[in-house]
């Protein structure tokens, strides 16, 4: 039984869809993003997607937000620290990291799963994970209780 499953079951029992909100962490600044995430949860967001900024996102709608977050110096370690603080404030709200593969690869796959778990992240969306790399990334995440979607 995961936070994601409990969240979806609660929404199903309430006969409503889940309000899943995406935030590019670091836009306009890491501190402002963290405050925004807290306000979104307090206002009723059921689940938060923590968007990791990337210099060349495939989803062009988030390109400008990613550029601003990168200009603000946002890094994956900082995002994980923010996730950890959000987790302490909101222990039942699912947090899903939304990232591109290059960011994860540069961070280091060997430490990724354990660091996601330590930060209280509930899932990983790796939107551009190549099929040939899934055999390495998926077991790392699953071994740490982090479901991954590609």
Give the positions of each predicted feature.
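Generic structural signal for hydrophobic
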Residues: 40, 86, 115-116, 141
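Hydrophobic alpha-helical segments and helix pairs
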Residues: 90-125
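Short, well-ordered coil/turn segments that N-cap beta-strands
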Residues: 14-19, 44-46, 90-95, 121-123, ...
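Active-site mouth loops of central-metabolism enzymes
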Residues: 19-35, 70, 94-108, 149
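Glycine-rich loop at the start of a catalytic domain that most often binds anionic cofactors/ligands
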Residues: 32-40, 60-66
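Active-site-adjacent beta->alpha loops and helix N-cap segments on the catalytic face
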Residues: 1-11, 30, 55-62, 72-84, ...
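Conserved, mostly hydrophobic/aromatic
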Residues: 21, 40, 48-51, 116
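N-terminal small/glycine-rich loop or linker at the start of catalytic domains
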Residues: 5-27, 61-66, 86-98
């Amino acid at each position: 039984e995961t936070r994601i499953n409990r969240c979806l079951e609660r929404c199903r029992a309430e006969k409503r869809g889940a309000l899943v909100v995406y935030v590019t962490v670091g836009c306009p600044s890491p501190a402002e993003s963290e405050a925004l995430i807290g306000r979104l949860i307090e206002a009723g967001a059921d689940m938060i997607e923590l968007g990791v900024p990337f210099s060349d996102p495939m989803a062009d709608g988030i390109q400008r937000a990613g550029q601003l977050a990168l200009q603000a110096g946002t890094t994956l370690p900082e995002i994980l620290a923010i996730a950890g603080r959000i987790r302490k404030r909101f222990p039942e709200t699912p947090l899903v990291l939304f990232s591109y593969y290059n960011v994860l690869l540069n961070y280091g796959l060997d430490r990724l799963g354990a660091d996601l778990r330590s930060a209280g992240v509930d899932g990983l969306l790796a939107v551009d994970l190549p099929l040939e790399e899934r055999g390495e990334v998926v077991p790392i995440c699953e071994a740490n209780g982090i479901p991954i979607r590609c």
